[in-house]
Amino acid sequence: MQHNNDFNAAIKSAARQLGIEKPRASVPAVDMSRLLENAGKEPKPSKKTDAEPKSIIPETPNLLLAPAGMVGTIVQHILATSHQPQPELAVAAALCLCATVLGRRVATSTGLRTNLQIIGVAKTAAGKEHARKINKDILLASRSSEFIGGEEIASGQGLVSRVAAHPVSLFQIDEFGLFLQAVQNPNAGSHKAEIVNNFIKMFSAATSIYYGTEYADQRTRPRVDIPHPCVVLYGTTTPETFFPALGSAHVASGYLNRM
């Protein structure tokens, strides 16, 4: 090299050629010896100082996971017989079962009924099925199978027909997120979209009367009216399918705040 390995001289020479020999501001000298000594060496792993990220969802208070009375008895049975106990799901299922049994029998001073709509969200293979199974077992053992609604609903009119025959019905729908996506699909027929609409209407009509659809042929297709329908929904789903299925339309329609 022209400067006999003198890097400072080389830099000054290059600066003169580029017209930047004199800096606009003073620059303090930098000791590069430590950097050159460590060149080529493997860096030591840095100590982890950041705290583990915390969930933004608060833990459920223990008091809410151990209710009293019949709800608590059902919760304890669900947990005691489960391979993967899920207290939150057990409470949700027990509430829906008791809400069904009490359907059209009790009301608050403001007219509220027991037509609950609860969605249990848990990861895949987290044991969502067990609580639904216990609900069915209890209703079957108590000879109350008439309360059990279908696990799939083909159309809005199918929902109306079921509730007209059994005004108190418990619908337990697995993969509820996929169900929402299916009924919202633009390629789905109007009979699918009517399912959610009828859930909303029957929820609101629990304190009065649900008035069905008027058809042109009143003789063969009369209007179906249902006094105080008690439609209880217990859906289970995974976060991956449920949250993408929610949108502003559910807020605008009022369906989201009914869950």
Feature locations, PLM:
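Phosphate-handling catalytic cores of nucleic-acid transaction enzymes
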Residues: 30-258
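Short, small/acidic-rich helices and loops at N termini and domain boundaries
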Residues: 1-47
